[in-house]
Design a protein with these regions (language model features):
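Conserved functional acidic sites
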Residues: 1-273
Length: 273
C-alpha cells in the first residue's frame, strides 16, 4: 500500500456489507493514472477490492516480509495491462496484474488481503449513438443509457435455452454471454449534492471476478457497487458454516455506497437546513 500511495493518487473507500445480511466491510482502492483528468485521453483507474471472508473475523492475514520482498509487482507496470487492452495488443504475463494482492504494514507486521479483485478501467467520454463494444474495461460516461431490463430481454431472446440470466443465477449452469452483448453499460445518471453519479453494470464473461454493478464519479472514482459472484454462490457451493447461504440478493437499484461519501452527503444535507 505504501508503494501505491507514494507513486499515485489513491482514493480509498469502505463499503458496509450489511444489506447482504452479513456485517462486514469491503475496502476499495481507486488508483489513478498520472494523466487522469488532464484531457490527454489517458484517464485510467485500477480498482482493488478487498472482499470479506465471512467464515473468519478478518479479511487480512499475516505474511512474512521475505515473501513480499521476493514477489512484489513493480509499480511502473501496474497500468501496463490497461494500455494493452485499450490498443488490442496481446498482454505479456509479467504485466498481468489480475493475481496481485494488496499488502499493508501495521507497525512492524505485514498483512496480505485474503480476497482481492483487481480491475483496470479506461475512462472515456465518447459520444456514440450506439454502445461501444467495450467488454469489461471502458467506463464511457457519454454512451446511451441501457437499462438492465433491455439486456435481459435481448439475452433471453438470443440464448433461449439458458436457465439463468447472469445477474439472477440460481443454478451452477452458466451460459456464455454473446460477444456482441459484452459491454460495460451505462444504466443511469443522477446528481447528488453536486456530484454527477454514473451508474454502470458489467455484462461480460468475467462476472466471477468483476464488480457487477457500480457507481462512478469523475475525480472520485468508483464509490459504490455490488459483487454478485462473491456473495451469491451457486446451489452446489459447499457452505461449511452456513454463513454464505444466509446472504440475500440486492435489488437492481441498490448499491453498497462508500461510507465516506455517505458522510459527505449527509453533511451537505445538514448544511442546507
Amino acid at each position: 500500500m505504501d508503494s501505491l500511495t507514494a507513486h499515485y493518487q489513491v482514493k480509498q473507500y469502505t463499503l458496509d456489507t450489511s444489506p447482504y445480511g452479513a456485517k462486514n466491510t469491503i475496502e476499495v482502492y481507486n488508483v489513478f493514472s498520472e494523466s487522469y483528468g488532464l484531457n490527454k485521453g489517458e484517464d485510467y483507474i485500477i480498482l482493488f477490492s478487498v472482499l470479506p471472508e465471512l467464515d473468519s473475523k478478518t479479511n487480512w492475514e499475516k505474511i512474512d516480509f521475505k515473501i513480499v520482498k521476493d514477489n512484489h509487482f513493480p509499480m511502473k507496470y501496474i497500468f501496463r495491462r490497461i494500455y494493452y487492452k485499450k490498443f488490442g495488443s496481446p498482454i505479456e504475463e509479467k504485466y498481468n496484474i489480475s493475481k496481485v494482492k494488496l499488502v499493508k504494514k501495521i507497525k512492524d507486521t505485514y498483512y496480505v488481503s485474503k480476497y482481492c479483485w483487481v480491475e483496470d478501467f479506461y475512462c472515456a467520454n465518447n459520444p456514440l449513438n450506439a454502445p461501444m463494444s467495450t467488454k469489461d474495461y471502458v467506463i464511457n460516461t457519454n454512451q446511451p443509457i441501457t437499462p438492465i431490463e433491455v439486456i435481459r430481454e435481448t439475452f433471453i431472446k438470443q440464448i433461449s435455452f439458458c436457465q439463468d440470466f447472469p445477474f439472477e443465477q440460481n443454478t451452477d449452469s452458466f451460459c456464455k454471454i454473446p460477444e456482441s452483448l459484452e459491454n460495460t453499460y451505462l444504466s443511469n445518471i443522477e446528481e447528488k449534492y453536486g456530484d454527477i453519479v454514473y451508474w454502470f453494470y458489467q455484462f461480460c464473461n468475467l462476472l466471477h471476478t468483476n464488480i457487477s454493478r457500480f457507481a462512478y464519479i469523475k475525480d472520485k472514482g468508483i464509490v459504490g457497487g455490488v459483487y454478485f459472484n462473491h456473495f451469491i454462490k451457486g446451489p452446489f457451493f459447499t457452505d461449511k458454516t452456513g454463513n454464505w447461504r444466509k446472504l440475500k440478493r440486492l435489488p437492481e437499484n441498490e448499491l453498497l455506497w462508500a461510507e465516506e461519501l455517505k458522510k459527505e452527503w449527509a453533511e451537505k444535507e445538514k448544511s442546507k437546513k
